[in-house]
């Protein structure tokens, strides 16, 4: 993208997204919000498409969004926002003002610096202990947002905090892995060759035992371009079955994760 300061310039920049298009569709997943009484940070993934009927042209895209909020006179307002374009498909002429991401070959000399650097911009850095006052289900669901962000941004330090020391899982295509050290090491090597990743997903079900401090959740993997049935029902290309343990109030870690490919809609989702 590009840098803009001031309300009017930011609004004008967003208006360009529709300037050459008849249709603009965007959906958001992987939501996170954390903060205090007057300041907060947020992140989410966005995917969608821009279309031009007269050209029968379409541009598909996936983005990572993070930013900060301030509360003034009882109203929360956007203070800053970073938008990184992860991937695009289709007719680039519909968004010539966008700064395209590196190609499938990865970074090359002359490429611009990335918009988001997780080690500096991850929303969990500003308020590492900001969630105890929210319902436990939100804290549990947030674990997937943190996990997917860390993996997709190749932030292994943040990813390590997502897992308990005794964690294990069936991580396709790597297989069964036991122990946080082996999990993070395997993910680091698996992630290294890929110029980008983006794991869009919805948390579908959570069951927790507050007294024991354990939980289980089902997460549906969203596939942009095939995310809904014809009648609008959410559609998923795979699911995660995850078990978690509370480390301290408001913070949960994964103890087990397994990834299972296979299409299903929201009405027939796997259950905990």
Locations of the language-model features?
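Short beta-strand edge/turn micro-motifs at domain boundaries
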Residues: 41, 62-119, 216, 237-272
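Short, low-complexity N-terminal intrinsically disordered segments enriched in polar/charged residues
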Residues: 102-149, 153, 161
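Short, surface-exposed coil-to-beta transition loops
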Residues: 26-28, 59-65, 199-201, 235-241
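Short, solvent-exposed loop/turn segments that connect beta-strands within catalytic domains
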Residues: 54-56, 73-75, 211-214, 228-231, ...
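N-terminal functional module detector in eukaryotic proteins
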Residues: 19-20, 57-58, 66-67
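A solvent-exposed, acidic/Ser-Thr-rich amphipathic alpha-helical stretch
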Residues: 1-48, 156-225
């Amino acid at each position: 993208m590009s840098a803009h300061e001031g309300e009017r310039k930011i609004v004008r920049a967003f208006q360009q997204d529709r300037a050459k298009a008849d249709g603009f569709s965007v959906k958001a997943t992987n939501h996170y919000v954390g903060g205090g009484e007057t300041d907060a940070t947020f992140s989410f993934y966005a995917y969608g498409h821009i279309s031009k009927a007269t050209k029968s042209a379409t541009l598909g895209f996936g983005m990572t969004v993070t930013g900060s909020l301030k509360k003034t006179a009882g109203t929360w307002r956007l203070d800053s926002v970073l938008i990184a374009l992860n991937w695009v498909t289709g007719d680039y002429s519909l968004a010539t003002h966008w700064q395209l991401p590196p190609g499938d070959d990865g970074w090359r000399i002359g490429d611009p610096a990335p918009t988001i650097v997780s080690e500096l911009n991850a929303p969990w850095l500003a308020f590492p202990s900001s969630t105890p006052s929210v319902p436990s289900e939100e804290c549990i669901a947030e674990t997937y947002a943190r996990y997917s962000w860390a993996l997709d941004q190749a932030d292994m330090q943040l990813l390590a905090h997502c897992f308990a020391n005794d964690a294990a899982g069936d991580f396709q295509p790597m297989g069964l892995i036991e122990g946080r050290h082996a999990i993070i090491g395997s993910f680091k090597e698996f992630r290294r060759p890929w110029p980008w990743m983006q794991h869009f997903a919805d948390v579908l079900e959570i069951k927790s035992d507050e007294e024991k401090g354990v939980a289980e959740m089902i997460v549906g993997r969203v596939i942009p371009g095939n995310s809904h049935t014809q009648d609008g029902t959410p559609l998923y290309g795979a699911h995660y079955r995850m078990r978690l343990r509370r480390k301290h109030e408001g913070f949960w870690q994964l103890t087990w994760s397994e990834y299972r490919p296979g299409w299903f809609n929201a009405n027939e989702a796997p259950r905990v």
